[in-house]
């Protein structure tokens, strides 16, 4: 007996010691991994701040992700999984939509959809992910923001970055479609620095309207911009300006200033930052990071800081250098037509001819534009200001240098379809607009009082009042009344209790600001009548209107203005 107990004790002690050593090793390993994650994260941030190449940054980011996966998965050496706890939350740059936010979002959807259809738009839906090669090489420096999906032994795929490239891919796959007005409202994904309260997210909706086909110059472009103006006016985003430019004017400027052909796109991306950074910072990026000669950068400055109305076009045409560039001259002709057509549509006063607008996406070939509001424009940082944290995972909602950004943008892309088409000459010219739902939402949500948004569309709450031993609660009667209201297109609810108290029913109706109540009084209902009461008034100020049961629907429709 003693030997058995001793062996049992020895066995338990040895096992406990081994477990303690294992846990100690695991703890030490976890500390080591945390230190390595911190060190690797600092290295990635350092490379980004130094303007290192994308290949070098991606290589170190991959190492950082491996370390994070190792931490979550536990020790690979032991082959055992670590029991980890985590904070229940949505991923950075995403959110759950509920309650009044959903109501406002649906209002934006329905508003722009009605306008898109008014102009002849038809719906197109494409997969949320595309083959990786479809998206590669279409977004310039922003390609680093594409989410690549992990290879599962099949096709290499990426989450869509926008709705434009998938549309062009669809056109290339359907050669019989040579013209179309298409709209698409769907989610896109970008690994950007999030600022949640300002609508800068990693998963967000775009509302796109595009016109594809061979038409006379600038006619579809002007209608696309007319659609944009109608949408922003209908949404009541406040005072806004749509900045206009032409890709060929920019190309002409870069050429006459002496920018090498292989640097034109990267210098264009630098110029596009002038809405957020002072010229000194943009110039430094051009010269120090991108190797442009200082005198070339100074020449560019003379052009890209220009902005104004259509009279700016006369000034540019009078420039001897630009007027000798065929690309710029062709763009001048386009702009003159566009200004005339926008004037015909009655929207010319909404536009600013802004030479700093470049749009970083590689697929634009002609007119480009971007809509900003007073609420969406970021504060331009002075070069003396200290830089904020470069952590790409940080939410930058409280960074006053980050605005909502452009609330809509777009342009002409004549060559994108041809990149995918089997025939080399299969080109379908396209022009389109894209509204950023979350950015518009953040502006509207800050302007509209909470009490002005109803989270529920119910117009009538069916109640029952009574008492005494014979009182049943009128559950089946309330169900029957709701059935009649639903059958006549009236949105109605009742409380899921057999014998609800009056206060419970009023509270349920008040929770969603239901405008009317249909009250089944114990005695009145027995006589074939119901009481229709307007809600939201002072207590006891209105007893309601007693109407025959058979007239209930017609009376409610008049009160609700359904007819």
UniProtKB/Swiss-Prot annotation:
Matches recorded under PROSITE patterns: AA_TRNA_LIGASE_II (PS50862), WHEP_TRS_1 (PS00762), WHEP_TRS_2 (PS51185)
Gene3D superfamilies xref list: Anticodon-binding domain (3.40.50.800), Bira Bifunctional Protein, Domain 2 (3.30.930.10), S15/NS1, RNA-binding (1.10.287.10)
Gene Ontology MF annotations: ATP binding; histidine-tRNA ligase activity; RNA binding
EC number: 6.1.1.21
UniProt catalytic activity: tRNA(His) + L-histidine + ATP = L-histidyl-tRNA(His) + AMP + diphosphate + H(+)
Task performed by this protein: Catalyzes the aminoacylation of histidyl-tRNA in both the cytoplasm and the mitochondrion.
Protein name, UniProt field: Histidine--tRNA ligase, mitochondrial
